[in-house]
Amino acid sequence: MRISFLHTVDGNKRVFDDAAKTLGLRVDNLLHEVRSDLREAVQDAGTFSAALKGETNRCLLALAAHADAVILTCATLGPAVEELESTQVPIVRADVALAAAAGKVGGKITVLCAVEAAVEPTRKLFERHASDTVTSVDVIHIARVWALFKSDNIDECFAAIAASANEAYEAGATVVAYAHPWMAPAVNLARNGSQPLDSVHAALRTVMQRIGGPSLGI
């Protein structure tokens, strides 16, 4: 069973490969394409134009032609999926999978976000997928971690993410969610007996549920 990915951060390839192994999936069945230029074009323009959405969807459909499922890992490009008509294989937004997983848990949801421009879209997304048991959605901008990540200060970056997760749990969060896939390695660094949710595992589990569960590893 083949899964294709459209990334805008090169480091996400390894993050998804590592997570796939923990879920019993075969890494040699994963195909990664990185298009950082699409995210950068949206950021430079300040809007997700119809032309950029069209280019994003062309990439997704090309990946879908050679896969049993496609995962879009960049939240910035996520709205393009809504304009796709029915496709032959599932196209899963990692951010939507995360929001849905958090919504099922319920209670007080705290989302850690590294990009200020993504705070409001993230809040709206999580509120849209909140179940009746969700009491609140709080999106916290942890500004310094994106700069640390881009400068390759990875250990300090993940330590800062975990510290923010610990603070959120201490403040009463029922569930803490990491908004960006590249944050996933910091999941196991959190304390307080709770494990934050990440979009990497959430997206892969969503594909497994839609396509065929553990048989994906065959």
Predicted regions and their residues:
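Non-catalytic structural scaffold of enzyme domains
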Residues: M1-I218
